[in-house]
């Protein structure tokens, strides 16, 4: 019996360092996946207001703005001012994109409605981002609240409030997560357009991991999910269900868009349509090809048709709220 115990202890002492090293390796690899994914590749803006303004008088009026977030960091965005006390619309881009992806839509929306338009860079996105890490919708939701506060602080030339009471939000994929959460928190968000929305932050993270690390995707996604606990020790990462957020959006206008170019998010968007309360005015268009997820690869005709759908939604829902 004593010999057996000694053998077990010897085996345990030999095995314990291996277990510890293996655990540390798993933690290190999982954090490495998150580190890479939370810092998407950077690229130059597709177009800037300076270049856009050469062809559009309205585009030449876009200004570059910064404002404080609630956690002490800063956000930035392009702002196109509208008429005094008119609604404002915030356009949120998808993961891996930046504010230049929504500039054309923003200018056309302003031309059609004279609403104030804000086009922010989400965390870790755009040239030389002000915040280095994306949190896949967690702290970005707090940033969206700060963006609304920034809009409410704007003054017109007459030193009156530039933006009226009502706000609209539009988002694609990551941007859709942010837009929905912002609407759930703020009843002044009256019009919500969501394109290719993931079911939650894990759904977005897994999709991104699968694209960046396609080998053994099921294993890498599990490791990445595990790594979020350590990497986002500040609580920025939240895996809240979009269905639960949708249940809080009462008596609002919602437009859901999706397409076969992002089939996973097409499915999650269709499922989301069943989560809103009965008094939500809901429109759906989930058979697009392409959706806003890959609209930059579309023809001019497809891009124009998509933009006009979004513009018509905000024009109808927010202009009626002004009356």
Regions found by a protein language model. Give the residues of each.
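Short beta-strand element of the alpha/beta-hydrolase
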Residues: 86-94
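An N-terminal hydrophobic leader/cap segment in hydrolases
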Residues: 10-67
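The serine-hydrolase catalytic nucleophile loop
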Residues: 95-108, 268
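Serine-hydrolase catalytic core
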Residues: 67, 75-78, 225-322
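Hydrolase active-site cap/lid region
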Residues: 181-235, 267
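Conserved alpha/beta-hydrolase
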Residues: 109-129
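Alpha/beta-hydrolase fold nucleophile elbow
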Residues: 159-173
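Alpha/beta-hydrolase active-site loop
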Residues: 134-161
């Amino acid at each position: 019996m004593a010999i057996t115990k000694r053998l077990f202890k010897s085996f345990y002492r030999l095995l314990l360092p291996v277990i510890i090293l293996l655990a540390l390796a798993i933690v290190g690899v999982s954090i490495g996946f998150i580190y890479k994914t939370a810092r998407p590749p950077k690229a130059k803006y597709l177009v800037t207001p300076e270049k856009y303004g050469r062809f559009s008088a309205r585009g030449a009026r876009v200004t570059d703005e910064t404002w404080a977030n609630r956690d002490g960091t800063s956000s930035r965005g392009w702002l196109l001012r509208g008429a005094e006390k008119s609604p404002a619309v915030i356009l949120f881009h998808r993961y891996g994109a930046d504010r230049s992806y929504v500039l054309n839509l923003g200018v056309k929306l302003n031309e059609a409605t004279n609403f104030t338009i804000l086009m922010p860079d989400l965390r870790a996105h755009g040239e030389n981002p002000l915040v280095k890490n994306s949190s896949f919708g967690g702290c970005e939701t707090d940033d969206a609240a700060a963006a609304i506060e920034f809009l409410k602080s704007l003054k017109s030339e007459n030193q009156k409030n530039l933006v009226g009471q009502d706000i609209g939000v539009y988002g694609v994929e990551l941007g859709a997560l942010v837009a929905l959460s912002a609407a759930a928190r703020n009843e002044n968000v009256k019009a919500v357009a969501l394109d290719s929305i993931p079911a939650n932050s894990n759904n977005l993270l897994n999709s991104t991991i699968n694209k960046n690390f396609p080998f053994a995707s099921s294993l890498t996604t599990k490791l990445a999910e595990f790594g979020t606990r350590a990497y986002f020790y500040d609580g920025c990462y939240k895996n809240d269900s979009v269905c639960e957020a949708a249940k809080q959006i009462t008596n609002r206008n919602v437009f859901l868009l999706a397409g076969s170019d992002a089939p996973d998010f097409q499915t999650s968007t269709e499922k989301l349509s069943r989560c809103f309360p009965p008094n939500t005015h809901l429109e759906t268009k989930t058979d697009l090809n392409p959706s806003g997820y890959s609209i930059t690869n579309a023809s001019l005709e497809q891009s124009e048709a998509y933009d006009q759908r979004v513009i018509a939604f905000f024009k109808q829902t927010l202009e009626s709220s002004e009356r």
